[in-house]
Amino acid sequence: MAERRVPFTFLTSPSWEPFRDWYHGSRLFDQSFGMPHIPEDWYKWPSGSAWPGYFRLLPSESALLPAPGSPYGRALSELSSGISEIRQSADSWKVTLDVNHFAPEELVVKTKDNIVEITGKHEEKQDEHGFISRCFTRKYTLPPGVEATAVRSSLSPDGMLTVEAPLPKPAIQSSEITIPVTVEAKKEEPAKK
């Protein structure tokens, strides 16, 4: 019996597609549900971030952004909101958090076991796109020695929440101690008889 060979060629049809059996039109790939589409050429995402809400632009890059009143400008401001910043100086510890979507009565700041917990929640509200509800919880560890009763919070008119705590003053520790020398008065000797 003679061997029968069927030649195989990739060009069996002019519209050859290597993944035609793999891709189904009903599948959604690379979708970010609930987030507005923002062209990526307006700014550069940081290399280690997969979520657009965690980025900060350099001052030189802010000129490349759309105007705040435009639809893309509003979407970009919503993506960049919620950023917190922790600062510690010699005498205080401070957290600043953007909570502009929440009213003061929707925010709770409390301390427990050397942890500051900030919670914000508002029920379903109507906006220009439909209904939306938001909630978040952020926890920050207080530096050692900070009194929980000394923690204070304030909300600015533009929606920036600041939580501050004074740091304890360190006791002065020195390896060299000066010991004062006291001079005693000379005792008079009793007269000899």
Swiss-Prot record:
Keywords: Actin capping, Chaperone, Cytoplasm, Cytoskeleton, Nucleus, Phosphoprotein, Stress response. CDD domains: ACD_HspB1_like. Disulfide bonds: none annotated. The keyword Protein transport does not apply. Its main location: cytoplasm. It holds the Pfam family HSP20. The modification Phosphoserine is found at residues 15, 80. InterPro entries: A-crystallin/Hsp20_dom, ACD_HspB1, Alpha-crystallin/sHSP_animal, HSP20-like_chaperone. One of its GO terms (biological process) is negative regulation of actin filament polymerization. It is found in: Cytoplasm; Nucleus; Cytoplasm, Cytoskeleton, Spindle. Smooth, cardiac and skeletal muscle, hardly detectable in fibroblasts or focal contacts. One of its GO terms (cellular component) is intracellular anatomical structure. GO terms for molecular function: identical protein binding; protein folding chaperone; protein homodimerization activity; protein kinase C binding; protein kinase C inhibitor activity; unfolded protein binding. Residues 74-182 form the sHSP domain. The keyword Phosphoprotein applies. Homooligomer. Homodimer; becomes monomeric upon activation. Heterooligomer. Small heat shock protein which functions as a molecular chaperone probably maintaining denatured proteins in a folding-competent state. Plays a role in stress resistance and actin organization. Belongs to the small heat shock protein (HSP20) family. This is Heat shock protein beta-1. It comes from Gallus gallus (Chicken).
